[in-house]
């Protein structure tokens, strides 16, 4: 099997990490730390299971199946087409890509001021730069893994080191009510809400292009290097999340009025470095959002290029970048209202697909996939609809957002027993 040098393996892991690590990944751990307080570490263990374990499992599942569409086609080819299109649009131009610009701009407002004109100019420059980098998805290892990812990690470490050398509080605060009884379970819920498993299903194709660009052509070697990159990215996420969660727990004790992860980080940066801290935080958010934007434009453009091969990849990448720029300026709130329920309906089915792929061979038959995914999807769609949500909440675990677990288990049993 073709092998890559250790340095190139590390670059692949850095590249995948940089695509995963967006604004939401910056915000969730500090908020978890501030809320969990003295119960931070058990809460973080639960958070890691769902916020790191699921995305890495998604990367591995797609690599083993030979692609996201191949994994979804185990249900049915038509399901695969519809499901993958919905997932790519939901995490792409309909939600995640526009939010990268709007979120990073919000962190710059305290430094440069606001205004529609300034936001428009910023978004044009932001998406133009992201488009230029995404023009060559096979070179993301050089652009993201070699340059931007190390810069991002270094800036986060500056914030963490400042907190270690000059802690803003002597100890963690008492936990909030939700984290007082079952901190690990609350951590699992928080990690689940990142919905990063969807990204794990999508980034594998772009990573495969970068592996091929390094001279690896054997399918098995591409698969193994993708899986290694997934585990390395997961390890980096674990370390960075722990750092951010720790500083969040200390900052929550010093500034208990902070209600969001962004407020926690802003309070910490200001306490440590003053105005320079706000500049540091803005740079962290800018790089994180830019990396994710490039990764999403690349994977969405690449998928639709395979679906519509007559349309060149640069044209598709440019279209998605331009559409995301417009949405981030004129219609993001409405798009979020529409896309969030769609994501909520898609996410359980994606998790079930990932989980099924790791089951023994006896479960690898179409009836298992059809029954399990179908019952999961029905429950998830009903939970996303406002007029049926109350009924679905009454199901076991429904009030926690896991009402799909029992239908999925029932579907698994029926599908397994089906001849």
Predicted regions and their residues:
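Membrane-interface loop-to-helix entry segments
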Residues: 135-163, 339-351, 370-378
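TM-loop-TM module centered on a large, flexible mid-protein loop between adjacent transmembrane helices
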Residues: 69-76, 240-290, 341
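C-terminal membrane-solvent junction of multi-pass transporters and transport-like membrane proteins
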Residues: 351-413
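Membrane-water interface regions at transmembrane-helix termini and the short interhelical loops
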Residues: 62-71, 127-148, 213-216, 325-338, ...
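Hydrophobic, membrane-embedded alpha-helices of multi-pass small-molecule transporters
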Residues: 11-21, 162-169, 178-244, 280-288, ...
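Hydrophobic alpha-helical segments and their helix-loop junctions in multi-pass secondary transporters
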Residues: 93, 97, 153-180, 197-198, ...
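Selective recognition of specific alpha-helical transmembrane segments in multi-pass small-molecule
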Residues: 53, 57, 151-163, 227-252, ...
